[in-house]
C-alpha cells in the first residue's frame, strides 16, 4: 500500500529525514515513536503533501503511484487521510458542511455518486453513535471553540466518515484525558480492517 524508498527531506536547509525506508501493507498499524524534533511530524506532512519541505531524494509510493507528483488534494482523494496534531479552526463554516463537501469531492474524484443530504446525515448519525459523540458536533463551526479533546475526536469522526485507505494519526493522543483517549482508541478499532492501513505518529506507548 505505502512504500517509502530512500527518502531524504530538509527544511530551511536543515536535514530532517535521511535515507528513510518504510513499508506499510494492508491491514497493518505501524507506530513511529520518538522525541520531539526527531522528524515524526515531518514524515506525516510530507506524505500528505504539505508545503515547506524539500525532498532531496527518494520516492513515496502509494498504491503503485509516486505521490510526490500529486498535490495535497489529489493525495487525499486517492485515499490518504491525515489527522492533524493541531486541527485548524474555521469560524463560520459548519462542521457538517465542511465534511460533506470533502466527502463528496473524494467520491467524485473516484467516480462515485455524491451523497445527498439524507444519506449523508444518516451516515453521520451511525458514525457519531459509534463514537458516542453529541449531535451538536455537526452543527458547530469547524473546530471553533472546541476543546483540544473535542478537536481530536472530530478528526477521528471525519476519518471514519471519509473511509481512507491510509490514515496517518499525527500525535492525536497528545494532551488527551482518559475519556477522550478511549474514544480515539475506539475510533481506531472501528477503522481497522484488512483493506486499509494506519500510520501512528506518537511519543507515547499508551495508544
For each predicted feature, which ranges?
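ABC ATPase C-loop
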Residues: 159-160
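Conserved hydrophobic segment flanking the Walker A/P-loop of ABC-type ATPase nucleotide-binding domains
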Residues: 24-26
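ABC ATPase NBD Q-loop/coupling interface
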Residues: 59-75, 143
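Q-loop/switch helix immediately C-terminal to the Walker
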Residues: 86, 92-108
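The feature captures the beta-strand-to-loop junction immediately N-terminal to the Walker
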Residues: 33-35
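Walker B catalytic motif
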Residues: 171-172, 179
Amino acid at each position: 500500500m505505502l512504500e517509502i524508498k530512500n527518502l531524504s527531506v530538509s527544511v530551511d536547509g536543515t536535514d530532517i529525514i535521511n535515507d528513510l525506508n518504510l513499508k506499510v501493507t494492508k491491514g497493518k498499524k505501524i507506530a513511529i515513536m520518538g522525541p520531539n524534533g526527531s522528524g515524526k511530524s515531518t514524515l506525516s506532512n510530507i506524505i500528505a503533501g504539505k508545503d515547506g519541505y524539500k525532498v532531496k531524494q527518494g520516492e513515496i509510493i502509494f498504491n503503485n503511484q509516486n505521490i510526490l507528483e500529486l498535490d495535497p488534494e489529489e493525495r487525499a482523494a486517492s485515499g490518504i487521510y491525515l489527522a492533524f496534531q493541531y486541527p485548524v479552526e474555521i469560524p463560520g463554516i459548519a462542521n457538517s458542511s465542511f465534511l460533506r463537501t470533502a466527502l463528496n469531492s473524494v467520491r467524485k474524484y473516484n467516480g462515485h455518486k455524491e451523497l445527498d443530504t439524507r444519506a449523508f446525515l444518516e451516515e453521520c448519525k451511525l458514525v457519531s453513535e459509534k463514537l458516542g459523540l453529541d449531535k451538536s458536533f455537526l452543527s458547530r463551526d469547524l473546530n471553533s471553540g472546541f476543546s483540544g479533546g473535542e478537536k481530536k475526536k472530530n478528526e477521528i469522526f471525519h476519518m471514519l466518515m471519509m473511509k481512507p485507505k491510509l490514515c496517518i494519526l499525527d500525535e492525536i493522543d497528545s494532551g488527551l484525558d482518559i475519556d477522550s483517549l478511549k474514544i480515539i482508541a475506539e475510533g481506531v478499532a472501528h477503522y481497522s480492517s484488512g483493506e486499509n492501513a494506519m500510520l501512528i505518529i506518537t511519543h507515547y506507548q499508551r495508544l
